Amino acid sequence: MDYVTQSPWIVTLIVAATTYCTLRWVQYWRSWVNVPVVGRRGFLGSWISTILWTWEARGCIQKGYEKNKDFAFQVSTPNGWEVCICNDDMIKEYKNLMDDQMSALAVTSETFQAKYTLPGADWDAVHKLVPQPALAKSLMWLRNRAANDTDPYFADFVKTFQRAFKEEIQVEQDGAPFPCFPRYSRIVAALTVKALLGSLENRPELIDLLCEYAEAIPLDGFFIALFPAVLKPIVAFFCKAPRLSDRLVKVITEEIARRELENKHRIPEDMTDWMAQWVKDNPGYCIESAVVRVIATFFGGIHTTTQLTVHTLLEIATRPEYVDPLRQEITTALKTHGGWNKSAIESMTKLDSFIKEAQRFNPLDAASLARQATRDFQFSNGLKLPRGTWVFAPNGPMLFDESLYPAGSQFDGLRFWKLAEQTQKPHDYRLVTASSKYLQFGDGRHTCPGRFMAADEIRLIVAHTLFHFDIAIKNHGPRPRNTTFKKICFPDMAAEIMLRPRKPHGSDGN
C-alpha cells in the first residue's frame, strides 16, 4: 500500500481507470432504449462489443435486421447504444423531423469531429453557418444550369473532364496497370472544383490540396474521436485536416475578394459566387460561413463520388457480358444527341442502371438516415428515445433483402433498367432517385442535394472510359475485395486497373 501511495503514476492510472468505468456505466444506462439488443449483453458484454465494433458493425446490423425487420434493435458502439429503426412507418416518422428534434448534422459532426476537421459541418456552430436550405438551393441552381441546353455550363463541364482525364489517365498501348482510386479521385476533384469554384479548376496545387484534405478528414476524425473531450484540441493540433482546412479557407476567401474587386456586380458563375451573393443578401452571416460550407461540399462530393466511380469500373472490368450492350447504348446516345452533352448522358439508361446496381451491390454505408435525438423523443407506437440517442435505418441489409430485391445476392447490371421498362415508371429507378427502400442518398428532409452533380460526374467518367478503352483488372485478375471499417464499405484503394485504347470506332465520341 505504501508503494501505491508513493507512486503518482499508479495513483493516476487507478483514478483514470475508475473514472472511465464509471463514465462507461453511466453511458450504458443513460442511452439504453427498450428494444432488442444485437451483440453482447450486459455492462461487460457491451464494452467488448464497443471494442469490436470496428470489425463487427456490418455483421451486427445484418443480423439485427434479419431478426427485427418489423421493429427496431440496438447495438453497443463507442457512442453508446445506437438504435436501428427497421419499421417503415417509424422510419417515415423520424426522417422528416426538424433538426431541433432529430439532427443529421450532429451525427456528421461527431463522426468526423467536424469542429476540428470540417468546420462547415460543425453542429456546435450551425447557427453561424449558411443554412442547409441555402446550400441545397445553390446545388439546385447548378442542376438547372446543367439541364439548360442554352447554358454553356455543361459543355464547359465536359471540357474540364476531358482535360482532367487526359492529364491523369495517360494510357499506354500495352495497357500498363495504374492505381484506380487516386487517379480517378483527381478527375472527380477537377469536376467538383469546376462546379464549385469555376476557373480555379486550372490550379493543380488546389486539386492536390483537396484530394489530400478529402483523405485526411475521415482518418483524423476517427483518430480524434478516440480521445476524451479535454484532449481533443491538443490531439487535433497535431493532425493534418485542420491545417488543410485553414489553407482552403484562405484560398477560397482570397478568390472571393479578388472577384469582388474585379466586379462588384458579378453574375454568379459557380457555387462560390452564388453563396457569396447569398451572404450579401442576408445580413448576419460572414463570408467565412459560406466558405466553410463550400469546403464541406467538396469533401462530400469528392470522396463518395470517387468510391462509386471505382466500384463501377471494377464491376465492369470483371463482368464482360455487360460491355457490348453498354457500349452500344453509349454510341447510340452520342450519335443521336451530337456528342457528349447532358441529353446524351441522360439517355444512357442502361449505364445508369449498371451504376445504380454497382452502388446497391457495394453499399457505402450499412446504415442510412443517421440522426441524433437532440431532445427526448417518442414514436407514435410508444417507443421512447432519450436525448442524445443515435438512430439509423438499415440501408445495407435492405439492399440484399429478397422481398425487396429478388435475387438480391446476385449482381444484375440491368436490374433497374428492366424494372423501369416493366413498370413504365423510369423516374422511380434512376440513380438519383431516393426512396424508403433505397437509402443510398438518404431520404426525406436530408436527401443528398448533391446527388445530381455526382450522377453527372460518374456517368460521364464511366461512359467515356468504357467508350474509349477496354478495361481489365491488373494481370486480368479477379475483382479486388472491398474493405470495411465500422459501417462503411470502401473499394480497394490500392486496386490497379488496365486500360487499353480501343480501335477507331468512327463515332462522335471525341
Curated annotation (Swiss-Prot):
Pfam families: p450 (PF00067). It is an enzyme of class 1 (oxidoreductase). One of its GO terms (cellular component) is membrane. The chain crosses the membrane at residues 9-26. Its main location: membrane. It comes from the Eukaryota. CDD domains: CYP503A1-like. It is found in: Membrane. It is a single-pass membrane protein. InterPro entries: Cyt_P450, Cyt_P450_CS, Cyt_P450_E_grp-I, Cyt_P450_sf. The keyword Oxidoreductase applies. Its cofactor is heme. Pathway: Secondary metabolite biosynthesis. Its EC number is 1.-.-.-. Keywords: Glycoprotein, Heme, Iron, Membrane, Metal-binding, Monooxygenase, Oxidoreductase, Transmembrane, Transmembrane helix. Heme binds at C448. One of its GO terms (molecular function) is monooxygenase activity. Glycans are attached at N148, N341, N482. One of its GO terms (biological process) is mycotoxin biosynthetic process. Belongs to the cytochrome P450 family. Cytochrome P450 monooxygenase; part of the gene cluster that mediates the biosynthesis of the indole diterpenes penitrems. The geranylgeranyl diphosphate (GGPP) synthase penG catalyzes the first step in penitrem biosynthesis via conversion of farnesyl pyrophosphate and isopentyl pyrophosphate into geranylgeranyl pyrophosphate (GGPP). Condensation of indole-3-glycerol phosphate with GGPP by the prenyl transferase penC then forms 3-geranylgeranylindole (3-GGI). This is Cytochrome P450 monooxygenase penQ. It comes from Penicillium crustosum.
